[in-house]
Design a protein with these regions (language model features):
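Intramembrane alpha-helical segments
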Residues: 30-118
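Transmembrane alpha-helical segments that form the membrane-embedded catalytic/substrate-channel core
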Residues: 3-11, 73-80, 98-101, 120-136
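Multi-pass membrane catalytic core of lipid/isoprenoid biosynthesis enzymes
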Residues: 1-3, 18-68, 143-180
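Residue-level signature of catalytic and energy-coupling elements of molecular machines
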Residues: 17, 88, 137
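Amphipathic, non-transmembrane alpha-helical scaffold segments
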Residues: 1, 91, 95, 121, ...
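Aromatic-anchored, glycine/proline-accented short structural segments
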Residues: 104, 110-166
Length: 180
């Protein structure tokens, strides 16, 4: 299920951003803007993988199946967030952070505290490193009215936010370690 969910999310990100990627020198050679994969074929890839994700989730257990539309909403929604919020990095963290809860639900069919704590840890960790990754596109984002923490707060502000997110991550690791 995880592979199909990731394929869906990655495919949708490339599909949704194809016109943005075509304008950015760093991403212009990605497969869709470069014409190696058609937008239509990318859309089919997304649809097939989303259906396979839902089918696999149903095979795992009923709760996983019931929550699969929510997971897909978060995974696909991330790709649109840079169009309206600088906090898109947090949404990416949430998209990846739901994996520990999803894995635990797949194995046990129930919720527990530890996977929720791990989700929080992954959210701050991924958000922190995505802010660093986004530094390379800060100027492009500003010029094209795209939202990101580096575009909104500048390089120094973004690094400060990334440091804070990483400090929270270290604290979460210590908290989880002392809890278990």
């Amino acid at each position: 299920a995880m592979v199909f969910a990731r394929n869906t999310a990655m495919g949708f990100n490339r599909y949704a951003d194809r016109s943005i990627d075509a304008m950015n020198p760093r991403t212009a050679q990605r497969d869709i803007p470069a014409g190696r994969i058609s937008a239509r074929n990318a859309l089919w890839f997304i649809i097939v993988n989303a259906l396979l994700f839902a089918a696999t989730a149903a095979w795992i257990n009923f709760l996983a199946f019931c929550l699969s539309p929510l997971a897909l909403t978060v995974l696909l929604g991330y790709s649109l967030t840079k169009r309206f919020t600088a906090w898109c990095h947090i949404v990416l963290g949430i998209a990846l952070g739901i994996a520990p809860v999803g894995a635990y639900l797949a194995v046990t069919g129930q919720f527990a505290v530890l996977p929720i704590l791990l989700t929080g840890l992954v959210i701050t960790w991924v958000s922190g490193f995505d802010v660093i990754y986004a530094l390379q596109d800060a100027e492009f984002d500003r010029q094209h009215a795209l939202h990101s923490i580096p575009a909104r707060f500048g390089i120094r502000g973004a690094i400060g936010i990334s440091i804070l997110l990483h400090l929270i991550t270290v604290y979460a690791i210590a908290l989880i370690g002392s809890y278990y």
